[in-house]
Amino acid sequence: GFGCPNDYPCHRHCKSIPGRXGGYCGGXHRLRCTCYR
């Protein structure tokens, strides 16, 4: 979701969440957007 497997839309989505610094695509087919602090 959130644009994956493209990292950029996922990263932007995560940056919009308070307390999150960004994100990346992970999971079996890089389809899960994972946010990091």
Swiss-Prot record:
Keywords: Antibiotic, Antimicrobial, Defensin, Disulfide bond, Secreted
SUPFAM superfamilies on file: Scorpion toxin-like
Subcellular location: Secreted
UniProt xrefs under Gene3D superfamilies: Knottin, scorpion toxin-like (3.30.30.10)
GO biological process: defense response to bacterium
One GO cellular component term: extracellular region
Domain of life: Eukaryota
Cysteines engaged in disulfide bonds, as pairs: C4-C25, C10-C33, C14-C35
Keyword Secreted annotated: yes
Chain's role: Has antibacterial activity against M.luteus and E.coli.
Family listed: Belongs to the invertebrate defensin family. Type 2 subfamily.
The name this protein goes by in its record: Defensin-A
Organism: Mytilus edulis
Lineage of origin: Eukaryota, Metazoa, Spiralia, Lophotrochozoa, Mollusca
